[in-house]
C-alpha cells in the first residue's frame, strides 16, 4: 500500500515540474499534427471543429482556480457546482468506411477557463492555433451551440477563406432581409431590408423532416456584420410549437459535392428537395462532443485528477485525452488493427492492453529462465511463442 501511495505522489509531483510540462506540451503538439495527417488523404472533404465546454465538480477547496460555476444541465436539484470549467475543441475528420465517408471524432485538447478571458475568446484562440494546420483548399466548419454563436467567435470566420460556422443561436437574435438592389436615387443605399421575425417570416416545410418542421431564409445579422448568411428555424408544431434558430455562413449549393458520398441519411440526399436544409443537418455532428465527454468522464477518469495547479491539471487532462484519441486513430493508421474501426474505443483499449500485458509477461518470463534455468528446449519454445504473439 505504501508503495502505491509513493507512486501516486511521484506521478502528481512530476506533473508539477516545468520539464514535464514542456514535454507534455510537445506531446500534445505531435498528437495534433498526427490528427491532421489523417485528413490529408481526403482533402476535398469538409472537416468540422466542434466547440463546447464541460465542467468537472471538485469537492476540495485547495485546487487552483476552483470556483462556483453555473451548470445549466445539472439534474441534482442545484444549478451550481464547485469545480473547474474546460473549453474543448473536437476535430471531426472524414475517413473511408464501407466505401462511404464516415466521420471520426477526435478531441484536440482542453483549456481551463480561468476567468481572465471569456470562454468565447478562449475558444477563438484555440481555433486560431489549429487553423494553420489546414491546407488552404481544406474546408473547415465550426459547430457550436448558442453560447458560442456570438460576434467574438463569428468574426473569426472572416479571418480565413476556408472557414465557416454553423451554430445554434438565441431565438431573439435580430435578423434582417438582405439589402435591396440600389434604385439609383440619391442618398446612401440601405444596408439591409426589413427586420424579420421567427414567428411570421419563415415558411415551414409541408412535412416534418425528422422531428421538426424547418424554415429557411437568407438573412443579415449583426453577429456576422454585413455578410449574408443562411438562417433556419425549426419547430415541433407549425403554429405554437417550440422554435429554435440556427445560423450558417455556408450555403447549401456549396455542399453539393460533400454530400454525394455520405454514409448516412439525410446527408446523402443531394437530389431531393431537402438539399437546402443540409447545413442544418450538419449541426448533428456537434453532439459527438457530448458523447466524448461522457466516455472520458465515466471510463477514462477525466474527472479524477488530484493535481492542484492549473498547469498540472491541464497537462494531465490533455494526456488522458491523447490516450483516448490514440485508441481512435490507431485502427486507421495501422492495418493490423483495422478490425477495430467499427468497435468502441473501450473495447479496443481492453484488447490492446491484454496483448501488451501478455507480451510483457512472456518477455520477463524468458529473461528469468535465461538467468536461472539453462534449458534450451524451454527457451526455444517460449521464444517461438513470443514470435507468434508478435506476428
Predicted segments — roles?
Residues 16-100, 108, 212-221:
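Active-site-proximal, Lys/Arg-enriched surface segment
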Residues 42-44, 58-62, 96-391:
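Single, function-defining residue in the core of a domain
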Amino acid at each position: 500500500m505504501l508503495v502505491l501511495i509513493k507512486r501516486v505522489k511521484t506521478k502528481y509531483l512530476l506533473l508539477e515540474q516545468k520539464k514535464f510540462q514542456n514535454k507534455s506540451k510537445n506531446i500534445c503538439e505531435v498528437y495534433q499534427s498526427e490528427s491532421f495527417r489523417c485528413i490529408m488523404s481526403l482533402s476535398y472533404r469538409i472537416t468540422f471543429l466542434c466547440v463546447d465546454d464541460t465542467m468537472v465538480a471538485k469537492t476540495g477547496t485547495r485546487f487552483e482556480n476552483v470556483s462556483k460555476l453555473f451548470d445549466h444541465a445539472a439534474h441534482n436539484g442545484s444549478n451550481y457546482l464547485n469545480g473547474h470549467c474546460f473549453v474543448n475543441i473536437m476535430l471531426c475528420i472524414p475517413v473511408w468506411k464501407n466505401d462511404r465517408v464516415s466521420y471520426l471524432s477526435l478531441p484536440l485538447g482542453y483549456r481551463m477557463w480561468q476567468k481572465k478571458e471569456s470562454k468565447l475568446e478562449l475558444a477563438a484562440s484555440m481555433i486560431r492555433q489549429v487553423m494553420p494546420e489546414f491546407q488552404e483548399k481544406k474546408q473547415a466548419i465550426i459547430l457550436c451551440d448558442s453560447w458560442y454563436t456570438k460576434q467574438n467567435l463569428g468574426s473569426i470566420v472572416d479571418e480565413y477563406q476556408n472557414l465557416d460556422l454553423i451554430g445554434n443561436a438565441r431565438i431573439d437574435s435580430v435578423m434582417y432581409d438582405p439589402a435591396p438592389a440600389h434604385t439609383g436615387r440619391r442618398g446612401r443605399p440601405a444596408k439591409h431590408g426589413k427586420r424579420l421575425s421567427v414567428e411570421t417570416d419563415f415558411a415551414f416545410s409541408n412535412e416534418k423532416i425528422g422531428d421538426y418542421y424547418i424554415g429557411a431564409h437568407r438573412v443579415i445579422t449583426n453577429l456576422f456584420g454585413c455578410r449574408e448568411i443562411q438562417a433556419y428555424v425549426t419547430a415541433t408544431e407549425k403554429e405554437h410549437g417550440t422554435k429554435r434558430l440556427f445560423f450558417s455562413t455556408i450555403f447549401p449549393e456549396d455542399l453539393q459535392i460533400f454530400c454525394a458520398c455520405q454514409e448516412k441519411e439525410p446527408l446523402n440526399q443531394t437530389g431531393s428537395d431537402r438539399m437546402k436544409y443540409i447545413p442544418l443537418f450538419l449541426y448533428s455532428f456537434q453532439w459527438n462532443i457530448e458523447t466524448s465527454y461522457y466516455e472520458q468522464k465515466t471510463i477514462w477518469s477525466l474527472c479524477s485528477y488530484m493535481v492542484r495547479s492549473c498547469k498540472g491539471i491541464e497537462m494531465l487532462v490533455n494526456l488522458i485525452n491523447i490516450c483516448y484519441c490514440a485508441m481512435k486513430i490507431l485502427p486507421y493508421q495501422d492495418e493490423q488493427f483495422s478490425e477495430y474501426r467499427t468497435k468502441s474505443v473501450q473495447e479496443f483499449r481492453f484488447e490492446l492492453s491484454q496483448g501488451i500485458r501478455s507480451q510483457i509477461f512472456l518477455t520477463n518470463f524468458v529473461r528469468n529462465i535465461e538467468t536461472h534455468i539453462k534449458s534450451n528446449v524451454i527457451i526455444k519454445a517460449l521464444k517461438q511463442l513470443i514470435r507468434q504473439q508478435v506476428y
